[in-house]
C-alpha cells in the first residue's frame, strides 16, 4: 500500500523536524515549508494527501492558514497545529475547513491519531481542548 503524502508548514524548523520524526514511519513527508509563498506553491501542486500547518504561519493577505488552504484546494484535508486552546480558535479553524486541530504541546501524543482520523474522513481535536 502506498504511504500517504504529507506536507508540513511551520515557520519553526525545529517543530517541522519534530513533526517529521513523528510521522516518518507511517507516512511520506514529501515537503516541509516555512512561509506563505512556499505553502501556496505546494498546495497548488496537488501532490499531497494531507497538510499539517501551524496556525501562525504569516499570511500576507490577512487570511488565516485554514482559510488560505481551503481557498487554494477545497478538497485537501488538513490538520492545524496551534499553541492556542481557546474554543474560539478551535471553532474558527474548523469553520474554515480544518479537519483536525492539535495543540503543539500535545503533538507527540495527538498528531498521529489526528492524521489517521482526518485521512479516514473524520474530524479530530486534541482531547485536552474539547469542550
Model-derived regions, located:
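Short hydrophobic/Thr-rich beta-strand motif most characteristic of the beta2 strand and flanking loop
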Residues: 7, 27-37, 42
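Conserved active-site segment of CheY-like receiver
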Residues: 11, 81-85, 104-106
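The short loop immediately C-terminal to the conserved phospho-acceptor aspartate in CheY-like receiver
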Residues: 12, 55-56
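Two-component/phosphorelay signaling modules centered on CheY-like receiver
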Residues: 13-31
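Acidic catalytic/metal-coordinating carboxylates
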Residues: 35, 61-64
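Active-site residues of response regulator receiver
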Residues: 54-55, 82
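Short amphipathic alpha-helix used as the core "switch/output" element in two-component signaling
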Residues: 63-75
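Short, flexible helix-to-coil linker/hinge segments that flank and couple to helix-turn-helix
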Residues: 88-95, 99-131
